[in-house]
Swiss-Prot record:
CDD domains: Radical_SAM. It catalyses: N(6)-dimethylallyladenosine(37) in tRNA + (sulfur carrier)-SH + AH2 + 2 S-adenosyl-L-methionine = 2-methylsulfanyl-N(6)-dimethylallyladenosine(37) in tRNA + (sulfur carrier)-H + 5'-deoxyadenosine + L-methionine + A + S-adenosyl-L-homocysteine + 2 H(+). [4Fe-4S] cluster 2 binds at C165, C169, C172. InterPro entries: Elp3/MiaA/NifB-like_rSAM (IPR006638), Methylthiotransferase (IPR005839), Methylthiotransferase_CS (IPR020612), Methylthiotransferase_N (IPR013848), Methylthiotransferase_N_sf (IPR038135), MiaB_methiolase (IPR006463), rSAM (IPR007197), rSAM_horseshoe (IPR023404). It comes from the Bacteria. This is tRNA-2-methylthio-N(6)-dimethylallyladenosine synthase. Binds 2 [4Fe-4S] clusters. One cluster is coordinated with 3 cysteines and an exchangeable S-adenosyl-L-methionine. Its main location: cytoplasm. Residues 10-128 form the MTTase N-terminal domain. GO terms for cellular component: cytosol. Belongs to the methylthiotransferase family. MiaB subfamily. [4Fe-4S] cluster 1 binds at C19, C55, C89. It comes from Clostridium perfringens (strain SM101 / Type A).
Length: 447
């Protein structure tokens, strides 16, 4: 395989599975390739490089990767110079890279979560030497700054502030595949945000597996609340969001920063996972139902108009009907504006995988459907309250469902679709909400 053969068509295609951190990793892979003269395509048929950036939080994500990898066999047959690369969390699992190469020997490059910055080097080796490259680092290295990044949006951007997780929830594989917590220096974060603002970006979402742990291990004396206040001082920036927060670490200082900093949006993603104190203990979440509800009350009392969103796992080992009803009642009490609901998925090498009393699939699905129905009913009622109100929306671009409309979000994260000129993209506009829908709002520009 030669460089010349592969350069006839310098197109690449990236498929991203999983969370926002994976999305930002893919933006970096795209940035590295574009800096080498490649262009992105969504059509695998015309790509000379295909990358799968994988997730392993749930079995379903892994099955999708295996299915899509199988479909690439014919493409590789048609074009032997096609380079197929697999990376991300799924590859970081013990034995997974070898399993992939055994089942799909036509894969050219495999790497994990700690060495994505080396992708150009791996690609060069494949193109120049015709070798197969597999490199999974078992230990996280230092944070690599300054990688080129190809952002999906021109209006809003993800900025990672820390990597890894130290919490070891019993159901979760993230600490095993993303490593221990490491924080970026605040000066590097501020520099990245200032560069984004200079390019016209208006909104930043700060990312981390647990943003509330930010600052641990750094030489400088700073915590997450301190970082939020620093980011709030960046001139020209309009809005700041963050995710994900662990309830046990969401401090009063962070709540007050959201309240007092004008650029911080009134939206908190606060994963509860279960409304049962017994199950929360089994999950190793380090808080109980009462602690969580007290935290919610504190947030609501300090931050008017705050919206709360969450993650919930249904069917954790040993979950009884009573435990499930505790979750339902907690959702009713909190009144979430949206919730990411998941059926528990067994993950190898996690404590929950070895637990007895795994819940049968039919019970899991029944509880899941009941939960989704209850949450959606509440969301519809909450969205109805916006009808007739005037809200400030940052215009993000054309609506996904109707390209004749524009779309954007309120400060507290509500999605609003409306008719307007494309010149408004990137602008803050006032919209009157004329109709509420289950998952979005319809607005009209206020002249």
């Amino acid at each position: 395989m030669t460089l010349e053969n592969n350069m006839d068509k310098k197109l690449f295609c990236i498929s991203t599975y999983g969370c926002q951190m994976n999305e930002e990793d893919s933006e970096k892979l795209s940035g590295m390739l574009k800096s080498q003269g490649y262009e992105r395509t969504e059509n695998k048929e015309e790509a000379s490089i295909i990358i799968f950036n994988t997730c392993c939080v749930r079995e379903n994500a892994e099955n999708k990767v295996f299915g899509n990898l199988g479909q690439l066999k014919q493409l590789k047959k048609k074009n032997p110079n096609l380079v197929i690369a697999i990376c991300g969390c799924m590859m970081q699992q013990v034995g997974m890279a070898d399993k992939v190469l055994k089942t799909f020997p036509y894969v050219d490059i495999i790497f994990g979560t700690h060495n994505a910055h080396k992708f150009p080097e791996y690609l060069h080796r494949v193109l120049q030497e015709g070798v197969q490259v597999k490199e999974i680092l078992n230990k996280e290295e230092g944070i690599v700054e300054g990688l080129p990044i190809d952002r999906k949006s021109d209006v809003k951007a993800f900025v990672t502030i820390m990597y890894g997780c130290n919490n070891f929830c019993t159901y979760c594989i993230v600490p095993y595949v993303r490593g221990r917590e490491r924080s970026r220096k605040s000066e590097d974060i501020i520099k990245e945000i200032e560069e984004l603002v200079s390019k016209g970006y208006k909104e930043i979402t700060l990312l981390g597996q647990n943003v509330n742990s930010y600052g641990k291990g750094l030489e400088e004396d700073i915590d997450f609340a301190g970082l939020l206040r620093k980011v709030n001082e960046v001139k020209g920036l309009e809005r700041v969001r963050f995710m994900t927060s662990h309830p046990k670490d969401l401090s009063d200082d962070v709540i007050m920063a959201i309240k007092e900093c004008d650029k911080l949006c009134e939206q908190v993603h606060l994963p509860v996972q279960s409304g049962s104190s017994r199950i929360l203990k089994e999950m190793n979440r380090h808080y109980d139902r009462e602690y969580y509800l007290d935290l919610v009350k504190k947030i609501k009392s300090e931050i008017p108009d705050v919206t709360l969103t969450t993650d919930i796992i249904i069917g954790f080992p040993g979950e009884t009907e009573e435990d499930f009803l505790d979750t339902l009642s907690l959702c009713e009490e909190v009144g979430y504006d949206s919730a990411f609901t998941f059926i528990y998925s067994r993950r190898n090498h996690t404590p929950a995988d070895k637990m007895e009393n795994q819940i049968p699939d039919d019970i899991k699905h029944d509880r899941f459907n009941r939960l989704v129905e209850a949450i959606n009913k509440k969301v519809v009622i909450k969205n109805k309250e916006y009808e007739g109100k005037v809200v400030e929306v940052l215009v993000e671009g054309p609506s996904k469902n109707d390209e004749t409309k524009l779309t954007g979000r309120t400060r507290n994260g509500k999605l609003v679709n409306f008719a307007g000129d494309e010149k408004l993209v990137g602008e803050l506009v006032n919209l009157k909400i004329v109709r509420a829908q289950p998952f979005s709002l319809i607005g009209e520009i206020v002249e």
